[in-house]
């Protein structure tokens, strides 16, 4: 019963307070305007930065809060509220511009008990520092005073929208920064790729330059060796301003170098053949080596043909051979018939058929050599007669000059046949070697090639010993 009486008394008091409030509405219109004016004059430093405070504390502005009647308020979890009197003050609140919001972290609270419904009444403002705020956190205690009410801040939506725009602007700036970084990264990668490509080209140029230097060094070494060999043979190359003589000299020097290279490779083939014969290799292995040596002989005959077109006298005189080899030379090379005589005693035992074949080959080679020798003698005789005719006439006459030019033209035509004689002599040598290979077996052919190589090697050694002999 006593509880019922207390409840009824509380209800009556609440009703009376509401009636008093409604009765005073008409007289409070002017103070509303005054309150609105005072709020406009509030210093920006006293306005609480609700957005920043809520963001730093981890709460949202639109959440609710409870304020006590003494001016201090308790914030619920993630909530801010403003306490209004039961009287309706719809027109006294003015939106606070974000430009006026500072980080002073103060809260201005209107105490509804100080509002007097009289014209020109002043609003009692209570400024509470953030140091006086209590009970931040998870609080579920609500103020049940009949003079308390919860309402949403009028500019909450606007602040939320501005806050969301700020959050959207941050990713945009981040995306712009990322794109800038991506551009820098792409530019850096492109520069690195260009640097790597330039370094690779530089290495290739350096490698090519080194290879050119190495090849030039090898060519210089070969030329020095040829000059040394030419000095040992008593060759003195004279310089001339005549372009044709210079060209022939270059051709002769090139042939000498090619012959030195050929001789070196020939010695390698002979060493391989000698090792195979000493190891008693099979006929198939020996045949491949013999064929390679025969092909190598064919190569030197081709080189001589090219050199004869540049300087036929150089090839015919055997200036690319040692002095001892030149002593036994015939038309720029060896005599086939003489070589077969030397091999007859080296290849025993031979069958009757092989002996007959060697004899016939030797006879035919001798006949061909005699024919070429006779043709060479006839050429020399004709050339001598051409140059000697008309040399007893008076010097300086126009007729003698014309006769002289005619004689030189005839002599030049006859010298052109020297190249033909040289080519026929080389063909005879090559055919003799090929016929000998057909008559002999593979192993006998290998022994014959070794004997020929040893013969010319001894001639070269004899020439070196002769040039190096002590002179009194």
Curated annotation (Swiss-Prot):
Residues 185-229 form the bZIP domain. Keywords: DNA-binding, Nucleus, Plant defense, Transcription, Transcription regulation. InterPro entries: bZIP, bZIP_sf, TGA_domain. The keyword Iron does not apply. GO terms for cellular component: nucleus. Coiled coil: none annotated. This is Transcription factor TGAL1. It comes from Oryza sativa subsp. japonica (Rice). The gene is TGAL1.
């Amino acid at each position: 019963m006593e509880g019922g009486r207390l409840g009824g008394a509380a209800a009556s008091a609440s009703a009376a307070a509401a009636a008093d409030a409604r009765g005073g509405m008409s007289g409070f219109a002017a103070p509303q305007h005054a309150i609105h004016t005072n709020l406009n004059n509030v210093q920006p430093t006293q306005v609480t930065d609700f957005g920043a405070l809520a963001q730093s504390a981890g709460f949202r502005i639109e959440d609710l809060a409870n304020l006590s009647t003494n001016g201090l308020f308790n914030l619920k979890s993630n909530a801010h509220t403003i306490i209004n009197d039961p009287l309706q003050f719809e027109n006294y609140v003015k939106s606070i511009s974000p430009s006026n919001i500072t980080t002073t972290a103060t809260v201005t609270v209107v105490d509804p008990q100080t509002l007097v419904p009289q014209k020109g009444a002043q609003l009692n403002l209570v400024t509470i520092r953030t140091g006086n705020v209590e009970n931040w956190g998870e609080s579920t205690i609500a103020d049940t005073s009949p003079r308390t009410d919860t309402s949403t801040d009028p500019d909450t939506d606007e602040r939320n929208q501005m806050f969301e725009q700020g959050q959207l602007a941050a990713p945009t700036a981040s995306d712009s920064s990322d794109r800038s970084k991506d551009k820098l990264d792409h530019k850096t990668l492109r520069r690195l790729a260009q640097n790597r490509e330039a370094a690779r080209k530089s290495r290739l140029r350096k490698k090519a330059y080194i290879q050119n230097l190495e090849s030039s060094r090898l060519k210089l070494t070969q030329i020095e060796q040829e000059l040394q060999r030419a000095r040992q043979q008593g060759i003195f190359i004279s310089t001339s301003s005549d372009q044709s003589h210079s060209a022939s000299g270059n051709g002769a020097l090139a042939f000498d170098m090619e012959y030195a290279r050929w001789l070196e490779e020939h010695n390698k083939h002979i060493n391989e053949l000698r090792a195979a014969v000493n190891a008693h290799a099979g006929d198939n292995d020996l045949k491949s080596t013999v064929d390679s040596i025969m092909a190598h002989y064919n190569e030197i005959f081709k080189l001589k043909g090219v050199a004869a077109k540049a300087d036929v006298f150089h090839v015919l005189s055997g200036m690319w051979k040692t002095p001892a080899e030149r002593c036994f030379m015939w038309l720029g090379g060896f005599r086939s018939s003489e070589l077969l005589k030397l091999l007859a005693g080296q290849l025993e035992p031979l069958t009757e058929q092989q002996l007959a074949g060697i004899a016939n080959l030797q006879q035919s080679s001798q006949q061909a050599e005699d024919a070429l020798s006779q043709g060479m003698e006839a050429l020399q005789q004709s050339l001598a007669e051409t140059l000697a005719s008309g040399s007893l006439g008076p010097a300086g006459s126009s007729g003698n000059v014309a006769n002289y030019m005619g004689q030189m033209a005839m002599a030049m035509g006859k010298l052109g046949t020297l190249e033909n004689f040289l080519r026929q002599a080389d063909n005879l040598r090559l055919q003799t070697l090929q016929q000998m290979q057909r008559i002999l077996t593979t192993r006998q052919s290998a022994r014959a090639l070794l004997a020929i190589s040893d013969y010319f090697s001894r001639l070269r050694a004899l020439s070196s010993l002769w040039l190096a002999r002590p002179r009194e």
